[in-house]
Design a protein with these regions (language model features):
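Conserved helix-to-beta-strand junction in the class I
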Residues: 124-128, 135
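A short His-aromatic
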Residues: 110-114
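Conserved N-terminal segment of class I S-adenosyl-L-methionine
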Residues: 1-103, 109, 119-124, 158-167, ...
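Substrate-binding/catalytic lobe of Class I Rossmann-like enzymes that use SAM or dcSAM, i.e.
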Residues: 175-176
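Short, glycine-/aromatic-enriched active-site segment of Class I SAM-dependent methyltransferases
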Residues: 135-160
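Helix-to-beta-strand junctions that scaffold the AdoMet/dcAdoMet cofactor pocket
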Residues: 115-116, 129
Length: 231
């Protein structure tokens, strides 16, 4: 897939709010991970910050002394986040990995499935922050593979060019030199508002199976991501 979709308006047309509607939900899970490990990072950078709304929401939940910086290579995304700057929060148009900056915590939230060489991206990010938090959609499931066109539709609308299961997502982190400290599932399919009718129909079986067998729910029915904390 041509990466120009992020600068020529294609991705913005397909995703007009650049997923800002999901930001409070994502920020809540990030804050939950940090609280589990009693982490209070003085500096936080989000790589591929999109609309910037995840950092806006996170800045309202973490300690007031924390400094937040968001980077995105897309001019379209930058137009959405540039007006959200305040004295604790900054946004920059550019590639964080081309800078010399280093932060206490780096966030890559639904990012590396869009990157052509995702291994090189994740390997480079590992060296640029003490801790990293990755949110990784688990697009591979029995249900998604059984539905003709599902993954290709995701490729076209969301720009996903790599597809992961729980095991392959965690293996990618380990293969790029990370030590996975902790991880947990998130379920956009059952926790986010305004789902389509197919997602609504699947909510009950997803919740029922997840309560007794979360790995099986993710593997068979899909609709899940993982949030991983790594060094």
């Amino acid at each position: 897939m041509d990466a120009t979709i992020y600068s020529d308006g294609t991705y913005l047309r397909n995703n007009p709010d650049w997923h800002a509607d999901d930001a409070a939900w994502k920020a809540g899970h990030i804050a939950r991970m940090l609280e589990r490990h009693r982490m209070r990072p003085p500096t936080v950078v989000e790589v591929g910050c999109g609309s910037g709304e995840v950092l806006v929401q996170l800045s309202q939940q973490l300690a007031k002394g924390t400094r937040f910086t968001g980077y995105d290579v897309s001019p379209n995304a930058y137009t959405l986040c540039a007006n959200k700057v305040d004295r604790h929060l900054d946004f920059r148009l550019g590639d964080y990995l081309q800078t010399q900056e280093h932060h206490d915590l780096a966030l890559a939230i639904d990012v590396f499935e869009h990157v052509e060489d995702c291994f090189a991206f994740v390997r480079a990010l590992r060296a640029r922050a003490k801790y990293k938090i990755y949110h990784i959609p688990l697009d591979l499931s029995v249900l998604s593979l059984a539905r003709p066109g599902k993954l290709m539709a995701m490729r076209k609308s969301a720009g996903h060019i790599h597809y992961f299961s729980r095991d392959t997502a965690l293996a990618l982190l380990e293969d790029t030199g990370h030590r996975v400290v902790d991880w947990f599932y998130t379920s956009g399919a059952t926790e986010l508002g305004n789902p389509g009718w197919k997602t609504r129909v699947m909510k009950l079986p997803r919740n029922a199976l997840y309560r007794s067998a979360p790995d099986a729910a993710a593997r068979w029915l899909g609709g899940y991501s993982i949030l991983a904390l790594a060094q």
